[in-house]
Amino acid sequence: CIRDRDMRLEPFFKALKKCVVEYLDHFAIDKSTFEVNFVKSWFTICDPGQHFPCHHHSCSHISFVYYLQTPGDPLILHRKNPNEWFGDAFKLITENRYNNGDGYAITPKAEHLVMFPGHLEHYTTPEDREHRRISLAGDIVLTLKHRTDTESGLLPPRYWKQF
């Protein structure tokens, strides 16, 4: 059964689009070049003692999490550290420093939005807590608005072909 798009969240996604444009501006990306496409979104309810294992969103350019209710447990963003000379070298450290870490923890609050590259591995930890964590998460794909004269960027779906 194909259903029409649920419009109850339209005001949220319009506000989120403005945040995505600000996010692109933070990196000095020409905002007028891209369409912001919300390709997936889902609600997540995480009960006490539950956690999400390390994963990434391979088909997404930008991923987001909007926290509706949170007991304060961290979201860990994980990246491969370019300073590491060989695999797992930084598992042998004696002290955490800015140049030898591979993770960044964010302790979100209710009504906070976190955006990050979809390829960035992330997870939550199994913290002792009394309350559920409830969030709305999703994936964004950026497509070129008008340009077809560049090797960079994803062409709009109107140029895609299926055979």
Where are these regions (language model features)?
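Conserved double-stranded beta-helix
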Residues: P11-P74
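Hydrophobic, well-ordered secondary-structure segments
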Residues: F12, L16-Y23, D102, H122, ...
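Catalytic core of non-heme Fe(II) oxygenases with the double-stranded beta-helix
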Residues: C46-M115, R132, L142-L154
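Short, cationic low-complexity segments
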Residues: D88, P156-F163
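Ligand-binding loop in jelly-roll beta-barrel domains
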Residues: E121, T125-S135
